[in-house]
């Protein structure tokens, strides 16, 4: 770790200016500094005090663990219309929305007509993104208790088989940012029946070929830190993680890890194939059985970029810790 670079960056947008870009696509023109591809720590100037923005490490997750993660979780990033600003501006001419009569469309959310009536809720572009692990109680559209997420409960064997991969991410978190890890672990242990075993995480969001628009993460423990990695299949370019307020971008690839402040505005650049990439990807056997008529963004490409965002839910602390994990396998989706 002695060859780790240290970068000290300044704001090139005010907080107000960058917030005005929420929900928009960010391209590589917002990367003003050399793209981070090697071991690097980045600090930003916050009114004269330098604070940690991210720590990037190259090739720190073994191929064996990558394979475990792929086999366990590749099918768990299911279509979602609830990703908010990160799903980007509503694409009314795209395959998914062109089949629907939209109403009250504003930026990244829209309503639509169902049998002549306006939908009761507004939704976002459909992307492949779902959480595994645990969630606190919610009452958005129906009252749900603290629970295993639906896709965890339905794929509990695969979830458990992939734990060594998730646990390696937590090890890197502990190694790189020990104080934040300690705070998060102590918090997670207060409701240990709602945490992923031998980690400081309650939840992992899995995304497939999801280019995020500019957003800040919400719902995670504010005293912790964001932890990300990717698993790749095939060849592609782009997909850089960009913090436009600081002009910094990182190229997070297979085997890499980044701990980053997910409460700072961030986004991904477009994923794309070169001609060489296309030729290589044309030889790949299909791993998925997606219906191309549905129009979920990004998932019909031959290449795959699975991203994993590991965190502790802020409100999981309010859950009743008396329930053992096995009880959630039969009751986690029952309404109360």
Predicted segment positions?
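Fe(II)/2-oxoglutarate oxygenase catalytic core
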Residues: 1-224, 228, 250, 272-278, ...
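Conserved metal-binding segment of the jelly-roll/cupin
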Residues: 250-265
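Short Gly/Pro-enriched loop/turn and capping motifs at secondary-structure junctions
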Residues: 236, 265-267, 314-315
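A short beta-strand-loop-beta hairpin characteristic of the jelly-roll/cupin
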Residues: 231-253
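Short, well-ordered beta-strand elements within core beta-sheets of diverse protein domains
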Residues: 284-285
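Catalytic or ion-translocation cores adjacent to nucleophile or general acid/base/metal-coordination motifs
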Residues: 244, 262-266, 277-280
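Contiguous, well-ordered alpha-helical segments that form the cores/surfaces of helical PPI scaffolds
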Residues: 223-232, 256-259
